[in-house]
């Protein structure tokens, strides 16, 4: 069994990201931290509701297994 390697996310630190999550959820915010399981700490997080409404939800931890897609919104 191979050993898990930490995700290559250092280049995304302190950058604004767009995250697509399971359940059709979409959030944007600034990456402040991560761990080997790809759990992310996102600051200034904004939930983009399907109605077009934006909800500011502050600093959150997003569990790695709920992330479908991650996109940088700033040059890395």
Curated annotation (Swiss-Prot):
Entries under InterPro entries matching the protein: Lsm7/SmG-like, LSM_dom_sf, Sm, Sm_dom_euk/arc, Sm_G
Domain Sm: 4-76
GO biological process: 7-methylguanosine cap hypermethylation; mRNA splicing, via spliceosome; RNA splicing; spliceosomal complex assembly; spliceosomal snRNP assembly; U2-type prespliceosome assembly
DNA damage is among the record's keywords: no
Subcellular location: Cytoplasm, Cytosol; Nucleus
Claim: RNA-binding is one of the keywords in the record: yes
SMART domains on file: Sm
Pfam families for the chain: LSM
GO cellular component: catalytic step 2 spliceosome; cytosol; methylosome; nucleoplasm; nucleus; P granule; precatalytic spliceosome; small nuclear ribonucleoprotein complex
Entry's Gene Ontology molecular function annotations: RNA binding
Keywords, alphabetical: Cytoplasm, mRNA processing, mRNA splicing, Nucleus, Ribonucleoprotein, RNA-binding, Spliceosome
Principal location: cytoplasm
Subunit structure and binding partners: Core component of the spliceosomal U1, U2, U4 and U5 small nuclear ribonucleoproteins (snRNPs), the building blocks of the spliceosome. Most spliceosomal snRNPs contain a common set of Sm proteins, SNRPB, SNRPD1, SNRPD2, SNRPD3, SNRPE, SNRPF and SNRPG that assemble in a heptameric protein ring on the Sm site of the small nuclear RNA to form the core snRNP. Component of the U1 snRNP. The U1 snRNP is composed of the U1 snRNA and the 7 core Sm proteins SNRPB, SNRPD1, SNRPD2, SNRPD3, SNRPE, SNRPF and SNRPG, and at least three U1 snRNP-specific proteins SNRNP70/U1-70K, SNRPA/U1-A and SNRPC/U1-C.
PANTHER family xref list: SMALL NUCLEAR RIBONUCLEOPROTEIN (PTHR10553), SMALL NUCLEAR RIBONUCLEOPROTEIN G-RELATED (PTHR10553:SF26)
Role of this protein: Plays a role in pre-mRNA splicing as a core component of the spliceosomal U1, U2, U4 and U5 small nuclear ribonucleoproteins (snRNPs), the building blocks of the spliceosome. Component of both the pre-catalytic spliceosome B complex and activated spliceosome C complexes. As a component of the minor spliceosome, involved in the splicing of U12-type introns in pre-mRNAs. As part of the U7 snRNP it is involved in histone 3'-end processing.
Family according to the record: Belongs to the snRNP Sm proteins family.
Protein name, per record: Small nuclear ribonucleoprotein G
């Amino acid at each position: 069994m191979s050993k898990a390697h930490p995700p290559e996310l250092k280049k995304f630190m302190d950058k604004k990201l767009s995250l697509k999550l399971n359940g059709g959820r979409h959030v944007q915010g600034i990456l402040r931290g991560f761990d080997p399981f790809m759990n992310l700490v996102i600051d200034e997080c904004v939930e983009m509701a399907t109605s077009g409404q934006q909800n500011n939800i502050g600093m959150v931890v997003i569990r790695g297994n709920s992330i479908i897609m991650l996109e940088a919104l700033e040059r890395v």
